[in-house]
Amino acid sequence: AGITEVALKNHYADKTNWRKMLTNNVEQIDLVAERLKVENLIPTEVQEYFYSQKNDLYEMHYPVLHYPSKVNSLSLDKTPQFQGKLTGIKGQYLLFEDGTVFNIRGSEGYIVNINV
């Protein structure tokens, strides 16, 4: 693990709750306050690499028409064929109208045909 990762692992979880993310049940965070907190946790030997611009915030907007209330993960091993209406994309996930979500990265190595 890197120097920064080791320093931050006791303060931040390294896992995103993907089910909460895909139902849009996410906690709002004050990113400016978090940046200040992280800046104080970064070890001295890597502080020169810390981007410390105070006001640069970027907001990501994902094209999602409808978030499901409950998600059902699509496994190509269990369900080799699937048909559904795409209602959104969030990160590496495709979201479908019936609550099915497809993790693109989790299906690396598969050959997938998509018909639109």
Language-model features and meaning:
Residues 2-116:
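Conserved RNA-binding domains used in RNP assembly and mRNA/RNA metabolism
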